From Swiss-Prot:
Cellular localisation: Cell inner membrane
Protein name as catalogued: ATP synthase gamma chain
Molecular function terms, GO-annotated: ATP binding; proton-transporting ATP synthase activity, rotational mechanism
Gene name of the encoded protein: atpG
One GO term describing the cellular component: proton-transporting ATP synthase complex
PROSITE patterns on file: ATPASE_GAMMA (PS00153)
UniProt similarity note: Belongs to the ATPase gamma chain family.
SUBUNIT field: F-type ATPases have 2 components, CF(1) - the catalytic core - and CF(0) - the membrane proton channel. CF(1) has five subunits: alpha(3), beta(3), gamma(1), delta(1), epsilon(1). CF(0) has three main subunits: a, b and c.
């Protein structure tokens, strides 16, 4: 049985750890509110933008738009979005696990795979794969639309040059405070929807009337499309990271309380044993004096 001093030292150490995890939980909860507000305010814009792009692409000649060029897929580029910091449970590991699954799948089909890593943790876990083409670390703490624009421009240039035939983005989507799920979404080529309206009609859905023409608007919107999708994924990861960290720190705090409780029982037993031994020594000494 450990000594009283050893057990007491362990209890003190675990209590200090509990204070740290509790503070980190509170910080994560505070940051989550801001990140969640930004994400939820951007979601409707991203959704409508994607819907408009799909409707526009479904109503014209897709061959006129380079970002819709569907060709034989020989090289796939995966954009992997993770956090820069850890201590958020299995959040980053789940995104990397999905990425590795996708890489194995495409390589089994004889396709080359390259990676763009956004976030330090993803890069640290994937750099040994030898597939990382570009790395954007240390931007997730204070990212902006300018970061998304830079990344989107790089991806578009790579696609237009024919270096990549297909582009997907993989990130941890925010479902709720308790649930963050890794998802993979196609970015390029832009997928058109099949329109049921007669050719030449300007209205692609009940929500839109395009003037002067859908082709001209599509040409103007294309450079913005990837910006929106990449920025949206980064916002989702920003909120998911804080939610995952809040949950992880809450679990850690609970675990610390359980450990302290168990150590306290051990301490009390050790103390009781020590007192019993002392009493036995006293009684034994008294008997010896008789």
């Amino acid at each position: 049985m450990p000594s009283l001093k050893e057990v007491k030292t362990k209890i003190t150490g675990v209590k200090k750890t509990s204070q740290i995890t509790k503070a980190m939980n509170m910080v994560a909860a505070s940051r989550l509110r801001g990140a969640q507000d930004k994400m939820e305010s951007f979601r409707p814009y991203a959704s409508k933008f994607s819907e408009a792009m799909s409707n526009l692409s479904g109503g014209g000649n897709t061959n006129a738009f380079p970002l819709m060029d569907v060709r034989d897929v020989k090289t796939v580029e995966l954009i992997v979005v993770t956090s820069d910091r850890g201590l958020c449970g299995s959040f980053n590991a789940n995104v990397v696990k999905l990425t590795e699954k996708k890489m194995a799948q495409y390589r089994a089909e004889g396709k080359k795979v390259s990676l763009i890593c956004i976030g330090k943790k993803g890069y640290q876990l994937l750099r040994k794969s030898g597939a990382v083409r570009e790395n954007y670390s240390d931007i997730m703490a204070h990212f902006s639309i300018n970061n998304a624009r830079e990344i989107a421009s790089d991806v578009a240039d790579n696609f237009l040059k024919g270096t990549a035939d297909k582009v997907e983005i993989i990130y941890g989507a925010f479902k709720s405070v308790a649930v963050q799920a890794p998802v993979a979404e196609d970015l390029l080529p832009i997928q058109p929807v099949v329109s049921s309206e007669p050719a030449g009609e300007q209205t692609m859905s009940g929500d839109y009337i395009y003037e002067p023409s859908s082709e001209e608007i599509m040409d103007a919107m294309q450079p913005l499309y990837l910006n929106v999708l990449v920025y949206h994924a980064m916002l989702e990861v920003g909120a998911s990271e804080h939610a995952a960290r809040m949950t992880a720190m809450d679990n850690a705090t609970t675990a610390c309380r359980d450990i302290v409780s168990n150590l306290t029982i051990v301490y009390n037993k050790a103390r009781q044993a020590a007192v019993t031994n002392e009493l036995m020594d006293i009684v034994g000494g008294a008997e010896a004096l008789k």
